[in-house]
Amino acid sequence: MNSMNQMNKDSNSINITGLTDEEVRQRVEEGFTNRTDISTDKTTKEIVVSNVFTYFNLIFLVITILLIMVGSFRNLTFLPIIIGNTVIGIVQEIRAKKTLEKMSLLNAPHADVIRNGSVKQISTDELVKDDVILLTAGKQICADAVVISGNIQVNESLLTGEADEVEKTEGSTLMSGSFVVSGECYARLEKVGNESYISKLSLEAKSMGGKEQSEMIRSINLIVKWVGIVIIPIGLILFWQSHFVNGESITKSVTSTVAAIIGMIPEGLYLLTTVALALSTMKLARKKVLLHDMKSIETLARVDVLCVDKTGTITEPDMKLKEIFLCKNSGADGTQTALTLDEIKSLILDYANASVDNNATMLALKAYAAEALTNNTSALHRTAVSQQAFSSSLKYGSVTFSDGTYLLGAPEFIMHEDFARIEEEIIPYADKGDRVLLFARYDGENVENGINGSVTPLGFVALANPIRANAVKTFEYFKSQGVSIKVISGDNPRTVSRIAIQAGIESAESFVDAATLDTEDKIADAVNKYTVFGRVTPKQKKQLVKALQAKGHTVAMTGDGVNDILAMKDADCSVAMASGSEAAAQAAQVVLLDSDFAHMPDVVYEGRRVVNNIQRSASLFLVKNIFSLLLSLFSVILMVTYPLEPAQVSLISMFTIGVPGFLLALEQNKDRIKGHFITNVMLKALPGGLTDVIAVGALVVCGEVFCISDASIGTIATLVLSVVGFMILFKISEPLNGMKYAVIIGNIAGLVFSGFFLKKLFALTDLSNICILLMIVFGFAAESLFRNLTLLVEKLRGSYEKKKGFNV
């Protein structure tokens, strides 16, 4: 409330009244609002359309019509599964969408707007053209505007790629999408909604190809793409061969071809992925974690280096002034300043009252100043002539009074080569983890361009920043999961190191002053050598992230301020605290809405659970696809009719792939993700797929030799494939537990029940003694073949990895 009153006072002092309610209403009617037509989220209609009108659903529709035309109704058993898959996919996506929309409202950007002569806070999409808004540090500029009063430093790197801060004064143009680094100004909106720069840029980016996909989604799309390409020509060849070469009836030719096509379609893979990700999104939302980007779940699961800022991440976001003390070596000759401690305190409190900054440090000083005023302390009697907001690159701010200019900031950056003179006075506080700022008098000009005059250190401000209660436990988790921590902060490296040690971060005693890392080569060497980086500029944070990525690491960056945005933008995954700057929260892929860093293990765990389980279940689906593709090629080469019917394929898929695959996707899994998704999935599926095709291929040959009927061969093949399917399920489910045993036993029971009581529905026939004997022999042979093929693939993979020196 006090800050809002201050805003009202400031706006009145420079006679800014803003728009009236009538003027706002008129602009809304004319369509000059800040709402855009660009959305990265699907509408409910788009979700339904994307799930119903798919390429594979079109194929299923065609083969359904063909089966109805030839009267093969029992082979439509796949239809309820396809319809169920589609409905479940739609329902879960819509549920996830509604959950995310509710959570997004909590993180929606707001603006301080001047209307009817007073300041009010509204959502940015409620702004209209010609509105006057107040911009302060940490705010993202929500529409194109022009500065009408004040002075700010703006970072336009998200738009232009240039990391340097740009000064904006009265008359300067502000581009939407940039963010305020420091200072304060009033700006009038000129282009809003679809007409703003960021909207046009977003529209152009959307038309050029949409969002980047995660490795898992790219891999699944690649698999589906190639299956989609080969499925039609193979299907046509199989039908031609069966009907025109082998002389089979239309009904037999259609059903055998449909069986091959159904086997090649990974119909449950997309559904499995969609549902698993949707459930994870909703689960994290209940823990106050908002995902701006779905791929961030997978990326965080693959992270092996986590970069964290100190304030707001390791420590609580709020700071408290601990002590103000005199500088003992104020003069060049080592003498103490002539000013008394009370006089220094008075100056510092006047500085705090005049400062335009609202960061954690200045809020602590302003709280102290407010308390001093309440206690009638002799302070707050100087009027500022000018102010320079704190700069993340310069590491200090300034206020000029009638009697001179005063600086407050990092001692090293204010004193430069004279820092050694006062360093010993700071060390005892830094060793306790306190943030220590230097208050100094400046005798020079143009302090905004750097210090070029004499500086007289007067005193120090020590601020306490308590460690989060759960920080130690959180960092212990990351250590146990093989995730390295890098602490990247703008504070004194000794202070940051001490805080990191208290938080239990491994090797936190290894620290470096980033001011000494003045080349990219030095930064590249430092990322391996040090854990704590102090006095880091925003540009250096970005360079450190890139250096880690260049060494093959998957990097996540957490932060809460505008000085973290550059690094967050280039990190593989970015995480922001909602209590920090609005710009950081909007730029991040993951937002911790309650700003509790202890939720990070939940996000990493959820990502690992989802990716590992999808990877495992995807292997089950691909076994069927590999088998069906290779068996189709086998049938074409040997000029035999495809031996299975669609109903038999549906039976095998239901109990050895579909149901267990979905249940296993909900299993707990904390394992770190290794290797590439498509490689892992293919290598796990290959032994099973090869076993299936060799077993069924040999069975077809035996059937020809011993004149066994096609119906009996189909039944034997179904049972043998089921045996192999459960062997694969056992292998993929390792290590087994009670839940996994229950899933496997339940599906075996379901298959046995269907085999005995639903034989006609699934095209199963009674077997003669020779057929039963053949089934037993092939069952044992398939078990041995699968076991040895699995060992062979694992051995070949191990040899390749050993040779290359990395995980495939």
Q: Where in the sequence are the language-model features?
A:
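Cytosolic catalytic regions of P-type ion-transporting ATPases
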Residues: 5-8, 18, 64, 77, ...
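Helix-interface capping motifs at the ends of transmembrane segments in multi-pass membrane proteins
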Residues: 58-80, 229-265, 278, 282-288, ...
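Cytosolic catalytic regions of ATP/NTP-dependent phosphoryl-transfer enzymes
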Residues: 178, 302-457, 463, 476-477, ...
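Cytosolic catalytic headpieces and adjacent flexible linkers of membrane translocases
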Residues: 236, 240, 247, 396-421, ...
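Membrane-embedded transport module
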Residues: 238, 507-556, 571, 578-740, ...
